[in-house]
Swiss-Prot record:
Keywords from the UniProt entry: Cell outer membrane, Chaperone, Lipoprotein, Membrane, Palmitate, Protein transport, Signal, Transport
HAMAP family: LolB
Chief place where the protein resides: membrane
Transport listed as a keyword: yes
Protein name: Outer-membrane lipoprotein LolB
Disulfide linkage: none
Subunit description: Monomer.
Species name: Yersinia enterocolitica serotype O:8 / biotype 1B (strain NCTC 13174 / 8081)
Record-stated family: Belongs to the LolB family.
Membrane topology: Lipid-anchor
NCBIfam families: lolB (TIGR00548)
Length: 207
């Protein structure tokens, strides 16, 4: 039986105002070297964050659809995480639970879908292309599998470019939360072709 695509028609642009600032100019200041000891120290601190959670505003923009939602990301281990998207009324639109070897997605009708590839399942069910495997690193301010990145004047990621299977993602870090240690992204934008993903992290809890 073919999988039915999840309809996001109920996701109203409540997050539009919150995400509008995501188009602001990235942090200014002289670029710093990715080989600098300050970056290596910051990177090491980020890699030590085995458990974290963050919530905020999510927007997916493409020629075919525009999706606005609230999101909650909870990472409990390097290969275990939960992603929740809710509409402005607080109702669950999508819940993704990823564990080693198996992914379960629950849609807004309560139907469960199981796969071993979370990124492919999201694509088939929602039409959204989200690089989940890399996003687990990027959302923390880590470059993941790419070495093509630049730093800001505080030795944090400013921009990265990631290429895989002929697809190129560019991630711009527009603001950081300095109320947590180490500093973590509070605004970022991912772009690939004609699609963009905007994330605004309201708060972080780390361990």
């Amino acid at each position: 039986m073919p999988q039915r695509k999840i309809s996001f028609y109920r996701l109203l642009p409540l997050a539009t105002l919150l995400l509008a600032a995501c188009s602001t100019t990235p942090p200014s200041g002289p670029a710093t070297s990715p080989t600098s000891p300050q970056w290596r120290q910051h990177e090491q601190q980020l890699r030590q964050l085995s458990q974290f959670q963050t919530r905020g505003a999510f927007a997916y923009l493409s020629e075919k659809q525009k999706v606005y939602a609230r999101f909650f990301w909870q990472q409990t281990a390097p290969e275990r995480y939960r992603l929740l998207l809710t509409n402005p009324l607080g109702s669950t639109e999508l819940e993704l639970v990823v564990q080693p070897g198996v992914t379960q997605l629950t849609d807004n009708q309560g139907k469960r879908h199981v796969s071993n590839d979370p990124q492919e399942m999201i694509q088939k069910l929602t039409g959204m292309s989200i690089p989940l495997e890399s996003l687990r690193q990027w959302i923390l301010g880590l470059p993941g599998d790419t070495t093509d990145f630049t730093l800001d004047d505080k030795y944090r990621l400013k921009q990265l470019t990631y290429q895989q299977d002929g697809v190129t993602w560019v991630v711009d870090y527009q603001e950081y939360n300095t109320q947590v240690t180490p500093a973590l992204p509070s605004r970022m934008e991912l772009s690939q072709g004609g699609q963009r993903i905007k994330l605004k992290m309201d708060n972080w809890t780390v361990k």
